[in-house]
Amino acid sequence: MKYFVVLVVLALILAISVGPSDAVFIDILDKVENAIHNAAQVGIGFAKPFEKLINPK
């Protein structure tokens, strides 16, 4: 989650500093951020069944 917050902050700083003319960089950074977020969600989805096997309630 920390990496996601760092990427959001960096995207905001970059968006403010470059302005609307260089929005391509923001688009690329946004796509990378979304890919990392989706990968983290998939990883959590894979980990939950193993967690339930190890720690049954």
From Swiss-Prot:
Answer whether the UniProt record assigns the keyword Chaperone to this protein. no
Q: What does this protein do?
A: Male-specific peptide with moderate activity against Gram-positive bacteria.
Question: Its GO CC terms?
Answer: extracellular region; extracellular space
Reported induction: In response to mating.
* Locations listed in the record: Secreted
| Impact upon substituting I44V | In strain: B316
Which N-terminal residues, if any, form the signal peptide? Answer: 1-23
In the UniProt record, the gene name given for this protein reads: Anp
Q: What is the effect of changing N34S?
A: In strain: B205
Lineage top rank: taxon:
Eukaryota
Provide the protein name. Answer: Andropin
Q: Name the tissues where it is expressed.
A: Ejaculatory duct of adult males.
Cross-referenced InterPro entries: Cecropin (IPR000875)
Pfam families according to UniProt: Cecropin
Give the organism the record lists.
Drosophila melanogaster
